[in-house]
Every structure is written in structure tokens, then in C-alpha cells.
Amino acid sequence: FVLASSGDTPYKNLAELASYAKNNDVVLGHFGAGIVPTKVSFAAAKKLGFEFADESAFDMLDCNSLSSGDADVINTTLALIEPCLNEINVLANIGEDRIGKLPNVATVAEQAGVNNIELWNGLFVKKGTPQNVKDKIAEIGKKAMLGDAAQALMKETGARVYWQDAEASSSRIVADGKKLAELNAILQ
């Protein structure tokens, strides 16, 4: 996920957005107030000393959302704004690392001091699944994530594609639960 604005806005990063928003109304478009990227956006604003004048959930947040003026800043995926990437400002990346395709765009964590939580997907099995089945699923999943198609998708879309085994994933769930609690505390 990224935070983006029209190319003609006077802010190019979160510090500039914060400065601008202290004296001007800025509307945030997002996919829902309860999802992690939106919470990160609100927490960053709070840490940087401003509030969005208004915010609204949308079914779609793409180039048209910015060009139509429906929102001043949108919280969306890089893939949805890819067609107009050269015409907009990507203010920040919401995630652990900078996006390879946008190496000069700092993460929200770097810019606002909020934690670096990000959305991720995983492979889950029903409790009681035999170990040999879990091992086979893990073998296939790892091969797919490290394969050429997945790596090409990462380069094309900016999505982070990687493999974590069951132990690392379990640890990540615990760590991300703590990060989410930290975000919720900031937003209280």
C-alpha cells in the first residue's frame, strides 16, 4: 500500500503533507477505516501533528480518484495507480521496506515514526493436517514464491513477494498483533 496525491499538490512526502494540512483541508480516501493501511495513515497524521479534514471509504482508489478530486490523498495499492505513476506524487509506502520500483519513496515508518506493519498473505491449513501434507504444501509454496513468475510480479507491481516458513510466520503473527495494538493505542 502507498499514500499518493495528484502531481500538482504542493506536498511530495509526509512532512510536507503535514505542514500543508495544518492550514488547509486535506481529504483522505481509503478502503475502510478498520484496515491496517488506513490505521497507519491516521497514526502517521497524528504523530506528525495533523488530522485529515475528512476521510471516506471507497470501493476503488485509482488514478481517477485523484484526477476527479474525490480525495486529496489516497491510501491504495501501487498496482491501482500504476497507469498514472508519472503524473502523481507517491508520498509514502506503507510496509516494512521501500518498494523496489520506488526506491526514493520512504516508508511511513521512516517518515512518521509509526511501526512498519504491512499486509501480507499466507498459506494456512486446518488443525490436524498431517505433517507430510504441510511439508508438501510448504515445499510448493516456497518454490512458487521464489520462482520467476512471482519475482516478475514483484518487479512489475511493487508487491513484496517472499517466503516465510511456519515458525517465522507464527512469530510474525505475534509481532504484528503487537504492532496493531500499538497503532490502536496511538489512535485512542
Language-model regions, residue ranges each:
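Short helices/loops that flank or line small-molecule/ion binding pockets
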Residues: S19-K22, F42-K47, M60-I74, A79-N86, ...
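Short beta-strand and adjacent tight-turn residues that come in two discontinuous sequence segments
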Residues: F31, A57, N75-T76, N93, ...
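Short, Asp-centered acidic motifs that coordinate Mg2+ and/or phosphate
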Residues: V2, D72-V73, V90
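Short, well-ordered secondary-structure micro-motifs
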Residues: V40-S41, L102-A106, D165
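C-terminal lobe and pocket-closing loops
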Residues: A79-M145, A175-K178
